[in-house]
Amino acid sequence: MSGFAAKRRPIAKYRNGRFVEEEDEIALEFPLTITVNGEEFATIVCTPAHLDELVIGFLASEGAIRTCSDIKGMTIDGERGFAYVELAAGGLPAKQFYAKRFIGSCCGKSRQFYFYNDMKTAKTIVGGITVKADDCIRLMKALHERSTDFAATGGLHNAALATPDEMVVIRSDIGRHNALDKLYGYCLRHQVAMKDKLIVFSGRVSSEVLLKAAKMGVSVLLSKSAPTTLALDLADELGITVVGFLRGQAFNVYTHESRIIIG
């Protein structure tokens, strides 16, 4: 159990017709305001663990950085809930970058990205890895077994970067998008290649989740939950295999089925 993920709190638990006084683990909720080059960039409500990775991954997802070398300096003030980031020369553009702009589809098969920065940074996956069906099941089981923070609180999302053979790193957060940003930040900080990896995820596969996977360059996304229609439309166009409802010995493959191998 991460000391930063939860806090013990007295509760009254109703059981067998009466209340019992107990202590329970409650997931921490923490606002983190990110400033970039002296300007407020965003405030993220998150779990206060691995905040450096969260900031790096979030900035990369937003298109503000490509690698950690784009960051000249970063200070995390965990007590006050601030992250101060200074980008290297030629980094973040001026004010227009802070306001997201809607980009709709134009003509032909143009992608229906939500925002301009998504259009710039999402990658179409060509090739990608293959995964055996049995390995999909084994990896989801491993995520569940190693998700100690969720087991204690019931209030956290978990995301793992893995090869078809083993877990590489697991991150947890109250926000499913934050858990993915922490993975992204970990990979950038430690220079971990992502193209030969997959994501194992506990949450719903929304369009935002799918776009984060695309920006990381990951070709396979496994989830125990359901996808949304827009997520699957994007997965089709971006070349990402989405596996959902991965529970027990069964799962659904929604897009690019050829990457999942039977036998």
From Swiss-Prot:
Pfam families: FdhD-NarQ (PF02634)
Keyword terms of this UniProt record: Cytoplasm, Molybdenum cofactor biosynthesis
InterPro entries, sorted: Cytidine_deaminase-like, FdhD
GO cellular component: cytoplasm
Listed name of the protein: Sulfur carrier protein FdhD
Catalytic residue positions: 107 (cysteine persulfide intermediate)
GO terms under biological process: Mo-molybdopterin cofactor biosynthetic process
Intracellular or extracellular location(s): Cytoplasm
Entry annotated with the keyword tRNA processing: no
Family: Belongs to the FdhD family.
General function of this protein: Required for formate dehydrogenase (FDH) activity. Acts as a sulfur carrier protein that transfers sulfur from IscS to the molybdenum cofactor prior to its insertion into FDH.
Upper classification of the organism: Bacteria, Bacillati, Bacillota, Bacilli, Bacillales
GO molecular function: sulfur carrier activity; sulfurtransferase activity
NCBIfam families, alphabetized: fdhD_narQ (TIGR00129)
